C-alpha cells in the first residue's frame, strides 16, 4: 500500500510537469534562457526538500491536505548548459532524474521510496504584465512584519504602563483605550480594586430580575404631611416605585390662620367664646336639628368654601396615587395641590360605599378657610357626582386637625345614621366642571329609596 501511494505521488508530479510543459509551449517561450531559469528553480526546490508541500507520512498515507499559498516570485541569472535539462526540440522538455541529487538515489521499484517533489510555477513576462494592469483588484498591505510587531509591542507596553490607573478610572469611551490589548488578570479582580455603585442604575439579580431598593428620597415637604419614594430595578427598562407618607411639623402660619378664623367665628356668632361643637351643632341628637342650623357664620363660611375650593376633576388623576400633585383648575385658572384619600383610614366602604378612589385638596398659604375639597371616583375612574359614593366638601381639613375634622364632617354623618340623602343636602357634592352625571338616574333613584327606607 505504501509503495502504491508513492508511485501515485510520483505520477502526480510527472503529470504536473507535463502540464507545466504545455503551459510553456502555449506561452511561446522558445529561448534557452527561459529553460535554464526553470532548471535553476527546479534545482533550488529539490535541494530544499525539507520545506516541501507534499510530504508522505507512514502514519497517514491516505490523508492529504492541499494548502493554497502564494508562491514567491524569485529571479535568478540564467545558467546555460546545465546537464539536468535537455531539449530535443524547440518545444520538448525531458526530466533526467539521475542528475537530481535527491532523486538520483531513489529506488522506484523499492517498497518505500523516500521521494519528495516540489513544483513551483513561475509566472511568465506576459502574465506579469497582465497583473500589473489591475493593481487595484488586490488588497495592499503596506505594513511590513517588523513594523507590525513594533506597533504591537508599543501597544502592549502602553497598556501595561496604564494598567495601575485604569482599574480606578477606566472609561470605555476613552480615546486612550486600546481595544486590541487585553489587560492581565481581566478575569479576576486585581488587588486594591475599588467598585463604585451608582444609584441611577442599581444592580439586580439576574435570577429573579429584581434589584435592591434604593434609599428613601427626601420628604416632599418641609412642613406638614408629605411623602417619600424609593425605587428599584425590576428588569430591562423597568423601575418599581414605592411610596410612603412622612409627617413634618405643622407649617408656620397655619396656627395664625386658625386663630384668625376663630376670632372671626366668635365675632360672627356674637360671642367671645368660640366652640366649634356648638357652632356646627354636631352634639345634637337629631339629624334634623343639625340640618336646621342656619347661623350667619355658617352661611358666610360655606360661601367662602365654595369660592375658595377647587372643582373636582372629572376623572381620577393617577399622578396622585404615589405623591401629591399640582392639577390645573380651569375654572379658578390656577394650580391646586391634591393628594390621594383612598387609604384604609378613610374607610370608604363605610362612608362612601360605591367609591373606589378618593382625593382631597390640600391647604395653602393662600387659603381663606380651613376647608378641603373631597372628590370620589368609581371603578371606571370617573367622578361620582351624586348618590351615596359622592365626595362632599370638608369644612375642616385633616391637614389641620383630624379630631376637629371628625367632629365637624364625620360625626354629622353618624348622627344622620348614614342617610346620605340628608347629609348631601347640607353638604352638596361638587360638580363645578359639569362632568357626566354618575351614577345613572336608575341607580340614583334606587339608592335614594334605600336611604329613605333605612
Curated annotation (Swiss-Prot):
Kindly give the Pfam families that the UniProt entry links to this protein.
AMOP, TSP_1
Compositional bias ranges of the Polar residues kind: 38-55
The disulfide bonds in this chain are 219-246, 223-251, 234-238
TSP type-1 domain: residues covered: 208-252
InterPro entries named among the record's database cross-references:
AMOP_dom, Angio_Inhib/Adhesion_GPCR, TSP1_rpt, TSP1_rpt_sf
Domain AMOP per the UniProt entry, residue ranges: 279-442
- UniProt keyword Cell membrane present: no
BP term (GO), one: negative regulation of angiogenesis
Keyword list (alphabetical) reads: Disulfide bond, Secreted, Signal
Gene Ontology cellular-component terms listed: extracellular region
Keyword Cytoplasm assigned to the entry: answer is no
SMART domains reported in the protein's UniProt record: AMOP (SM00723), TSP1 (SM00209)
Q: Which domain of life is it from?
A: Eukaryota
Regions of biased composition (Basic and acidic residues) lie at: 128-137
- The annotated region (Disordered) lies at 29-93, 125-144, 161-209
- The record's principal subcellular location, in a coarse class, is secreted
Q: Self-association or partners: how does it assemble?
A: Interacts with integrin ITGAV/ITGB5.
Say which family it is in: Belongs to the isthmin family.
According to the UniProt entry, the note on domains is:
The C-terminal AMOP domain plays an important role in the anti-angiogenic function of ISM1.
Q: What does this protein do?
A: Acts as an angiogenesis inhibitor.
Provide the protein name.
Answer: Isthmin-1
- Write down the species: Mus musculus
